[in-house]
Structures are given as C-alpha cells and as structure tokens.
C-alpha cells in the first residue's frame, strides 16, 4: 500500500513538472512569435507553395495590388491539395510533409494573412520536441526536476528558438530528429529486453514502430534526415556486434526497411527530387569527393559548436570534448554502460551529421538552418553529460543531492539563455 501511494505521488510530481515545462515552453514561443517578422525569401516560398498557382505567381513589369499578393499567400476557394503537390514537385528541393501541415493551417486561417499560419505548425513541433526531450531525460535520470529544467534549458537556446521562428520545415525536422533519438534511447536499453512477458514483447514492438514512424516523418520533412539514420544505425550495429546481439541488428534493419516502404508509397518522387533539382549536381559532386574531405571533420564540428554556443564557442570547442571525456571517466563501470552508449550515439551522430552536411552542401547554400536538428543533439549530449557527472560525483543522497542537481539544471538554463539573437 505504501509503495502504491509512493508511486502515485511520484507520478503526480512528474505530471506537474511536465505541465510546467509545457506552459513555460509555450510562453517562450508565443513571446518570440509575437515579434516575428518575415525577412527571408524562403519563408515567402512556404506560403507560395501552399497557396499559389505556381512557385512565383508574380508578374514582372505589371502592377499588382495588395489583394494580388494576399491571394498568392493565403488559402482561397481555388486552392487545392493537388496544386500544392504540383508546386512541391516543381520545386524539387524538399519533401511534402511540412507543406501539408502548413496547408492544413492555411485552410483553417482562410484569407487571413498572418505569420502565425506557419508558426502554428512550428509551435506544435516546438512543444513536441520539448515533450520528447523531457521523456529522454526522465528515462535517463528518473528526476522530474532535472527533466523539466533540462528541457527548458534546451528550448531556451538561441538555436531552438530560431528554428521555431523560421517559417520553414526545420522545427518539424528537429521534432522528428528528437523522436528518432528517443526511439534509439529506448531501443538501446537492452535491460528492458530481459523480461519476455507479453507486455515486454508489446513494448519492444512499440519502440521499433516508433523508430519506423520517426524515420518516415523525418525523411518526408527533410532529405538530410537520412544521415541521422545512417549514423545511429551504424552505432547500433557496432554495439550489437560487441554484445553479440545480432537479432537486434535484424530488428532495427526491419524497422528501417518498413519505413523505406512507407516512404516510397507516400512519396515516390523523392529520388527524382534528389537527383534532378537545381542543386543536385553540386551535392552529388561533393558526395563523390567526400573521402577527400576527411580532414575537414573539425570544420563541421566547429560550425555546429559555434551555432550552439554563440559567443562562447571558442571556449566550448575545447570544453565540450573535455566534458564528454570527463563523463566517460566518471560514468565508468558496467552499471553506467547504458548511459555511456546513449551519449556515444548522440554525440557521434551529431559529429557525423555536421561533417557530412558541411561537405555535401554547396558553399553558396550553406546555412544555419540545415544544422538546427543537429544542434539539438549537441545540446542533449551536453546536458546528459553535465547531469550524469553531477549524479556520480555527489555522493550525498536525498534532498541534498536533488538540490545540487537542481543547481546544475539552473546553470544550464542560464548558460543556454545568455545569448538570444533569435531570428525573427
């Protein structure tokens, strides 16, 4: 009975922490969203592709009224789904999922022209990303306070707020990246596979279905998502071979294969889009020379660290790897093997993605937005390492330990919120 009451109390605390996290996140987003101004041409393309007859429905050397522009950017009776799909295929640069979501928002908004048409989609993705980060930290540290503070620390960063404020697909892309990371965190917990009860089997199936859903959503939002998949699958193979869990490699591969089937059924235009758009030649040319650029791994790392830590990036170029190294030393022993594997996968995938995207993207197209999802991985690795180190070195238990850990969480929030040049 006492155990039941304790569990109920713990669940209530988690619920309160979760609700507080969501509320704070929503306030953050709405605050910055109210100051949003469209200053980037691609944001106009978002509205054009969803609501117009073509990619550029503006006539040169002809007077166009305000209503002409408004009609091109808002949903009307003559706008329909198939027209939007045709626009996406003509554009050939991005998959359709984000545009479909904005199409739904535009249909609900009607002829009202507002930045919140696109930001509403980003708001759900921003809050969803926060929820997933909360669940990841809950899984690793079993602390409502750390889960809440760590999540707020992530969402308060310049990079996450900028992703949310950009009326493009990168916040949704970040959401699916977070979901994919969470699915990998669950899949890499091999202790959970020991029990073979019906409930345990269903839970195992569920985590691979989650993995599959994340891959489908991620790839249908941004084609670069495939590099995250390749990186995490590579680490899964390495760990499973090391632990002689060859069946787990097969499970993971089957989940990816099922995802590939769904992707091809839902959007079979992906291959044409990737190989024949205006930038394909440059990307493919860079891909053929990728092994000649192995020496530039550092530049990919430097780029993403600079985007995450802003003015403090020079210090964090050294501090971040030192932090990870200290984590590996402090969190030694078999009892910490799970959290070490999680950090290895997240930090390793972040580095690999930064390198590949930096090499493949033509220099003229290189932009912060391609790295927003990767920045989330860097932030996760950073926060997990800090919390794990504090957890190991603070020997005192109970309230004293929770106090120290809370202080660590607050420090992370202060660090992350020190530079707020958000792109609005």
Write out the residue ranges for each language-model feature.
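Hydrophobic/aromatic-rich transmembrane helices and adjacent perimembrane loops
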Residues: 173, 227, 361-399
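Transmembrane alpha-helix segments characteristic
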Residues: 148-150, 210, 253-257, 333-360, ...
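Specific aromatic-rich, kink-prone transmembrane helix
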Residues: 104, 132, 152, 156, ...
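Transmembrane-helix signature of polytopic, membrane-embedded enzymes
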Residues: 133-156
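Membrane-interface alpha helices of multi-pass inner-membrane proteins
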Residues: 201-223, 257-258
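Hydrophobic, aromatic-rich transmembrane alpha-helices
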Residues: 237, 311-341
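Transmembrane signal-anchor helices characteristic of membrane glycosylation enzymes that use polyprenol
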Residues: 11-72, 257-271, 413-415
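Transmembrane-helix motifs of polytopic, lipid-linked glycan transferases
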Residues: 117-141, 179, 329
């Amino acid at each position: 009975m006492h155990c039941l009451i304790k569990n109920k109390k713990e669940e209530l605390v988690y619920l309160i922490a979760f609700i507080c996290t969501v509320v704070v996140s929503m306030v953050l987003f709405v605050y910055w969203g109210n100051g949003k101004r469209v200053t980037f041409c691609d944001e106009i393309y978002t509205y054009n592709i969803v609501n117009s007859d073509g990619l550029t429905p503006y006539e040169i050397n002809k007077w166009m009224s305000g209503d002409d522009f408004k009609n091109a950017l808002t949903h009307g009776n003559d706008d329909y789904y198939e027209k939007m799909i045709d626009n996406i295929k003509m554009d050939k640069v991005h998959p359709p999922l984000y545009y479909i979501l904005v199409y739904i928002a535009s249909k609900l908004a009607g002829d009202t022209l507002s930045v919140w048409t696109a930001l509403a989609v980003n708001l759900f993705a921003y809050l969803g990303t926060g929820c997933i980060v909360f669940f990841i930290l809950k899984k690793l540290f079993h602390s409502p306070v750390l889960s809440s503070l760590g999540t707020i620390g992530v969402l308060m960063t310049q990079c996450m707020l900028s992703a949310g404020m950009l009326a493009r697909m990168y916040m949704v892309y970040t959401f699916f990246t977070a979901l994919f990371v969470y699915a990998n965190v669950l899949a890499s917990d091999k202790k959970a596979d020991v029990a073979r009860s019906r409930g345990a089997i269903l839970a195992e199936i569920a985590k691979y279905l989650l993995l599959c859903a994340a891959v489908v959503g991620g790839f249908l939002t941004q084609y670069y998502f495939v590099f995250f998949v390749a990186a995490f699958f590579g680490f899964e193979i390495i760990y499973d071979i090391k632990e002689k869990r060859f069946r787990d490699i097969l499970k993971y591969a089957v989940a990816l294969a099922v995802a590939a089937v769904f992707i091809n059924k839902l959007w079979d235009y992906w291959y044409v889009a990737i190989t024949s758009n205006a930038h394909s030649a440059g990307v493919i040319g860079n891909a053929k020379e990728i092994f000649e650029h192995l020496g530039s791994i550092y530049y990919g790392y430097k780029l993403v660290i600079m985007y995450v830590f802003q003015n403090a990036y020079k210090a964090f170029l050294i501090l971040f790897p030192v932090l990870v190294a200290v984590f590996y030393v402090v969190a030694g022993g078999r009892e910490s093997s799970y959290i070490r594997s999680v950090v290895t996968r997240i930090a390793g995938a972040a580095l690999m993605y930064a390198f590949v995207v930096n090499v493949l993207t033509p220099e003229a197209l290189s932009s912060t937005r391609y790295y927003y999802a990767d920045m989330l991985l860097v932030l996760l690795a950073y926060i997990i390492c800090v919390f794990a180190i504090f957890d190991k070195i603070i020997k005192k238990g109970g309230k004293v330990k929770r106090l120290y850990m809370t202080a660590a969480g607050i420090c992370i929030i202060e660090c992350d919120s020190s530079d707020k040049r958000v792109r609005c």
